[in-house]
Design a protein with these regions (language model features):
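Juxtamembrane/disordered regions of integral membrane proteins
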Residues: 1-158
């Protein structure tokens, strides 16, 4: 009962201009500039985000996730040494990063009408992949570092 109501709550008001502003950094520069020029929405644009904090928090989150997965699967998957663990998590993390780029960002996000602002309905305006590719490229070293840290943690575990 809790999960369906949580899903309904998070889905509520999706596709509205205010809700779309939460993902403001994902929009192409052309869209961001149009939002800044919009009298109503420019006041609601989220404050800038410190990218160093975002990268560090992503590394911490994925190191914890990889560490938990590794601790659970250490003997099942046969992680016998650092390199086994590191390669597994490196492949897993980079595959996740690539999936996010191709499926979520390039195939879904740019083509769904839910992410469009009411005053910019043209699909063509949302097609510039630069922000998504930049995010993917930032993810490569982040996932590599998370894999490295998780592999180190697994080496310490009995």
């Amino acid at each position: 009962m809790f999960i369906p109501s949580l899903s309904a709550t998070s889905y509520k008001n999706t596709g509205t201009d205010e809700k779309n502003l939460l993902g403001f950094r994902s929009y192409p520069d052309e869209i961001q500039n149009m939002i800044y020029r919009n009298e109503n929405l420019s006041k609601k644009v989220p404050a800038g985000i410190n990218m160093i904090k975002v990268v560090i928090s992503n590394i911490v989150v994925f190191t914890v996730i990889f560490g938990i997965i590794g601790a659970i699967l250490k003997y099942t998957l046969g992680f016998e040494n650092f390199m086994d663990s590191f390669i597994y998590f490196l492949i897993f993390g980079e595959a996740l990063n690539l999936f996010d780029l191709i499926v979520i960002d390039l195939l879904w996000w740019r083509n769904t009408s839910r992410i469009r602002f009411s005053f910019i309905p043209e699909k063509e305006m949302y097609q510039n992949p630069k922000k998504h590719v930049d995010s993917f490229l930032r993810g490569i070293p982040s996932f590599a570092l998370s894999a490295l840290l998780a592999a180190c943690i697994l080496c310490i575990l009995p």
